[in-house]
């Protein structure tokens, strides 16, 4: 960089190992290559410049020539065509030749000439009535090539002129033929004249228009026009633009039409049917499109594009009006007409279902007009799918889609699809049957995920043969051990998808919906809708399918909730279906188990999986495992005793986590025996949720105000829980009522007795939960419908017998009444009678003036049962549940059905198992299993009545009911200890005593069986608190 002082030039040494010659050769080659590329680029630029110059010169020459021709035209025919006569349209005239050559839509003068030309055309046709001779002269056949070229060019020029000036003519685009003075009306009527179906050139014009993307031009005109004030206040008259479409649409290439088939991207389906609510704008076009042959053509065209995975929808759609949703709504709007035709084929129904399925899969979930989601009811949380963020359909478009898939559409579609597999047919085509079943299932599955579910379910359950057809198909496949694979038109299903997957995922929710209205006589006696033998087979099929999905081939990451991301349906539809499948099959099996519990028609073990072992149970306790997922999703697959073990393990873990405080930190209650409910309420209500989970120690105070003897090691608390539950749930106190079979449920009129009745219900919920939390069984027989509320389940008509069998019989009488129900003079009101106070309550707004008729009797029945089962006790049940869930989470309770839940609360109704108690008894103080006193004791115990056995159990354990799983699980184990050293007179005069906290019986060595029985009976019947201890 800087001068070093040495002027000599030193030789540079290249250490790269290459000679200078080699380096120079490489450099030369690189320079040559660059020079060659430079010359090539220069050549391309010169060529491009020449083309641009040539194009420019051509356009300039064309413009000059066009201007010259325009000048000559105006000189000859006038600026406003004032020199034109009818012969100007003939082949020999230069009028059309010159005009079509120089016409430019953006030129205002040219546009005026075009309008005047079309006005003259209409005038000449009106006067002569023969448009063919107007264009061809005397002989059309000899001049048809020229004439055809001119008329198709003229027709397109009229449409193009309006399209190019659509923004300027925004308010004139949607005009009627009667508005003859408006330029757009004149142009469109000229096109209509040229498209008369009787004319010989009509197919050539339509083919030319379609090649020039006429439907795209019309779409853009309509889109512009709809923004104008006129577009928002349309009359019912036919529009000129609509008339043109009506004349073009029937040209679908079938005889006698000879039009070429248009590219689907620019077809009527892609360009016009994707216009939002097009039938409101063009109602007459709807009538034309509803023609079976036209609809079949366009719907088949859409179905073919879907199967080829070809995107033909326009891109310039708004989020509120996506093209696929508009196409779906407009297509389904006319599908009823097609499906109602006697000649409607299976292929046509399949195409309609395929198109509807594809676009329904893409839609975000649609809400019903009442604002409810697809589910229809709060409990029916089948198929919840999260809304797609930022994608909200326009309300009118939503309404169009939901109104289109109505009862008539569903009925007609299923009838056509199942026509070949009707229940009465002896022979059937297996391939057609699989095709029909697969198509119907895929469409309905997509509809369930998108549309308001309650309305669809009601239609399918009560107005179609869907359940019977699907069941016969599944039954036959199961018996033959051959499931047909779903047809190839269901592109999102992999080839190895089980054939039962889609039919079952549709069958289950529909059949479950049917069971909500079926009464006991229909189900058990009439065996409708399925026979009991079929139901037994159905249970086997459902159980096998569910076990296959949840255990054998489970999802990688099962969704434990019932909400499934809509992204999943796009990324992995098969996973979404499998997840959905697990939910609906579980729900149906659970409902069938409820029916079996009401009146057994199959063994309870039929609902249980065969592969549940101790390893499975150990896995089920751990969160995140497959076994734990099965426990939450389908607990009935696991035997009851295994679930009880899991439940008791969960309780023990929870107690251990809250029982680590020292003895001085425990909650202590001082309870007066004659004020047990009042004291328990005041002291227990003051505890926090955490304190409730901790140990509670009780000291009883007798009637004299003296504390009873005994230190509470758990036994006194058990006694307290048994006595407080007996007092609190006593119907005499007024918080609960009894059904006819002495089952308890909240008193609807509790507020008339206790001002703080809701707080008491919260307390009672906590009290019951505390008993279950501590593993104490209490004798409280709840009505089945009320136990459902602990599981947060909604009660339906079939739950009514557990509350009011008499009312249930009356409602079923109404349901089956053959005469005119209005003659019974019933109204939508219900009579409440609480403590002699009679009040009327409307079941619907204005119900006192709404008579019950044959049309609305089912609604009346459901409203009455809902009022009695849910509405009347909703506040009491809600507060009870809040208190209950302070200690017992919902997921623990969901493992059990209502009948099992009653066993969890109260234990088995069977008598005490003395042999089980004997096999799990320890001995101390000199006693052993073969001691003569012990032998006498067990003989006495077996001779006791069930009531005395319960008294004994309460005497030694503090609770009159044994452990759920038997005395093996009694902690600590029951023990009999010798109470005195010898059989002296003093010792045998003593009474047996107990230590309930240790489950210990102190038994003196009585000499005779009679004496032992007398002393033991006295001790267990004294009810002397803990003073005997």
Swiss-Prot record:
In short, the EC number is 2.3.2.26
Active-site positions on this chain: 997
Give me the reactions it catalyses: S-ubiquitinyl-[E2 ubiquitin-conjugating enzyme]-L-cysteine + [acceptor protein]-L-lysine = [E2 ubiquitin-conjugating enzyme]-L-cysteine + N(6)-ubiquitinyl-[acceptor protein]-L-lysine
The annotated regions of Basic and acidic residues compositional bias extend over 8-20
State the organism's lineage.
Eukaryota, Viridiplantae, Streptophyta, Embryophyta, Tracheophyta
Q: Looking at the Swiss-Prot or TrEMBL record, what is one Pfam family this protein matches?
A: HECT
Q: What is this protein called?
A: E3 ubiquitin-protein ligase UPL6
**This protein's encoding gene:** UPL6
Domain HECT, which positions?
688-1029
By sequence similarity, the record places it as follows:
Belongs to the UPL family.
Q: Which residues form the IQ domain?
A: 45-74
Which positions carry the signal peptide feature in this UniProt record? none
Q: Which UniProt keywords apply?
A: Transferase, Ubl conjugation pathway
MF terms from GO for this chain are: ubiquitin protein ligase activity
């Amino acid at each position: 960089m800087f001068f070093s002082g040495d002027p000599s030039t030193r030789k540079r040494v290249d250490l790269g190992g290459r000679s200078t010659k080699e380096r120079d050769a490489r450099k030369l080659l690189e320079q040559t290559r660059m020079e060659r590329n430079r010359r090539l680029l220069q050549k391309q630029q010169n060529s491009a410049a020449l083309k641009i110059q040539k194009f420019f010169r051509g356009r300039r020459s064309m413009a000059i020539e066009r201007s010259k021709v325009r000048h000559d035209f105006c000189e000859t025919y006038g600026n406003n065509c004032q020199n034109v006569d009818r012969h100007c349209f003939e082949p020999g005239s230069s009028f059309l030749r010159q005009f079509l050559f120089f016409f430019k839509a953006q030129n205002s003068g040219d546009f005026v000439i075009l309008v005047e030309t079309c006005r003259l055309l209409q005038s000449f046709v009106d006067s002569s009535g023969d448009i063919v001779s107007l264009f061809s002269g005397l002989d059309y056949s000899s001049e048809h090539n020229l004439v055809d070229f001119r008329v198709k060019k003229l027709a397109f020029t009229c449409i193009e002129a309006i399209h190019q000036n659509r923004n300027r003519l925004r308010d004139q685009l949607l005009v009627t033929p009667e508005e003859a003075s408006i330029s757009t009306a004149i142009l469109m009527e000229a096109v209509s004249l040229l498209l008369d179906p009787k004319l010989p050139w009509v197919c050539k014009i339509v083919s030319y228009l379609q090649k020039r993307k006429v439907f795209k031009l019309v779409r853009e005109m309509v889109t512009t026009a709809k923004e104008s004030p006129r577009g928002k206040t349309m009359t019912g008259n036919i529009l000129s633009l609509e008339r043109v479409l009506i004349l073009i649409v029937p040209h679908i290439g079938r005889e006698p039409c000879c039009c070429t088939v248009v590219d689907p991207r620019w077809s009527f389906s892609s360009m016009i049917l994707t216009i939002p609510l097009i039938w409101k704008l063009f109602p007459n076009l709807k009538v034309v499109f509803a023609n079976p042959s036209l609809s079949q053509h366009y719907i088949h065209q859409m179905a073919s594009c879907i199967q080829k995975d070809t995107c033909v929808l326009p891109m310039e759609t708004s989020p509120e009006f996506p093209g696929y949703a508009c196409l779906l709504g407009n297509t389904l709007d006319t599908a009823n007409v097609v499906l109602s035709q006697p000649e409607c084929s299976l292929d046509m129904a399949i195409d309609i279902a395929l198109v509807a399925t594809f676009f329904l899969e893409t839609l975000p979930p649609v809400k019903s007009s009442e604002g409810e989601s697809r589910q229809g009811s709060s409990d029916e949380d089948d198929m919840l799918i999260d809304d797609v963020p930022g994608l909200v359909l326009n309300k009118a478009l939503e309404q169009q889609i939901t109104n289109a898939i109505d009862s008539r559409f569903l009925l007609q579609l299923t009838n056509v699809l199942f026509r070949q597999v009707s229940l009465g047919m002896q022979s059937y085509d297996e391939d057609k049957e699989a095709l029909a079943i697969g198509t119907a299932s895929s469409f309905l599955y997509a509809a369930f995920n998108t549309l308001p579910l309650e309305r669809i379910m009601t239609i399918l359950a009560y107005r179609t043969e869907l359940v019977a057809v699907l069941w016969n198909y599944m039954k036959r496949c199961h018996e033959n051990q051959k499931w047909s694979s779903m047809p190839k038109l269901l592109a999102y299903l992999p080839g190895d998808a089980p054939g039962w997957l889609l039919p079952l995922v549709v069958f289950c929710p529909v059949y479950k919906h049917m069971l909500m209205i079926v009464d006991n006589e229909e189900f058990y006696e009439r065996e409708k809708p399925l026979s009991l033998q079929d139901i037994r087979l159905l249970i086997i099929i459902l159980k096998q399918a569910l076990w296959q999905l949840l255990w054998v081939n489970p999802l990688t990451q099962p969704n434990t909730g019932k909400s499934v991301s809509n992204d999943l349906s796009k990324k992995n539809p098969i996973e979404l279906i499998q997840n959905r499948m697990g939910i609906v099959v579980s729900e149906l099996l659970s409902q069938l188990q409820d029916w079996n519990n009401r009146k057994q028609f199959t063994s309870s073990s039929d609902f249980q999986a065969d592969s549940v072992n101790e390893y499975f149970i150990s896995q089920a306790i751990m969160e995140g495992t497959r076994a734990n997922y099965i426990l939450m999703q389908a607990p009935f697959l696991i035997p009851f005793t295994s679930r009880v073990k899991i439940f008791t393990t969960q309780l023990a873990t929870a107690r251990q986590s809250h029982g680590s405080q020292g003895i001085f930190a425990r909650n202590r209650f001082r309870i007066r025996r004659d004020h047990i409910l009042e004291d328990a309420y005041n002291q227990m209500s003051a505890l926090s949720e955490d304190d409730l989970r901790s140990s509670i120690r009780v000291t009883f105070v007798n009637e004299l105000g003296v504390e009873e003897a005994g230190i509470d090691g758990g036994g006194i608390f058990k006694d307290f829980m048994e006595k407080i539950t007996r007092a609190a749930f006593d119907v005499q106190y007024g918080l609960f009522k009894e059904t006819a079979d002495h089952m308890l449920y909240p008193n609807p009129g509790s507020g008339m007795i206790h001002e703080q009745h809701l707080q008491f219900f919260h307390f009672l919920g906590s009290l019951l939960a505390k008993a279950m939390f501590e593993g104490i069984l209490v004798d409280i027989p709840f009505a089945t419908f009320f136990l459902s509320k602990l599981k947060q389940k909604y009660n339906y008509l079939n739950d009514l017998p557990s509350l009011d069998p008499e009312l249930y019989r009356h409602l079923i009488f109404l349901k089956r009444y053959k005469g005119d129900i209005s003659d019974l003079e019933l109204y939508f009101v219900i009579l409440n009678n609480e403590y002699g106070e009679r009040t009327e309550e409307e079941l619907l707004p204005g119900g006192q003036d709404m008579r019950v008729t044959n049309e609305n009797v089912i609604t009346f029945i459901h409203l009455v049962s809902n009022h009695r089962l849910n509405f009347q006790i909703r506040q009491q049940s809600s507060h009870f549940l809040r208190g209950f869930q302070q200690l017992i989470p919902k997921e623990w309770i969901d493992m059990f059905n209502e009948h099992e839940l009653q066993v969890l609360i109260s234990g088995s109704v069977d008598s005490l198992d003395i042999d089980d108690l004997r096999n799990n008894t320890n001995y101390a103080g000199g006693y052993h299993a073969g001691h003569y006193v012990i032998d006498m004791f067990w003989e006495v115990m077996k001779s006791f009545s069930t009531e005395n056995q319960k008294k004994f159990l309460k005497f030694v354990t503090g609770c009159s009911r044994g452990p759920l799983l038997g005395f093996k699980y009694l902690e600590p184990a029951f023990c009999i200890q010798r109470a005195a050293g010898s059989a002296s007179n003093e010792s045998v005069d003593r009474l047996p005593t107990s230590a309930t906290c240790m489950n210990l019986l102190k038994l003196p060595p009585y000499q005779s069986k009679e004496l032992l029985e007398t002393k033991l009976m006295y001790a267990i019947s004294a009810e002397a608190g803990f003073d005997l201890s």
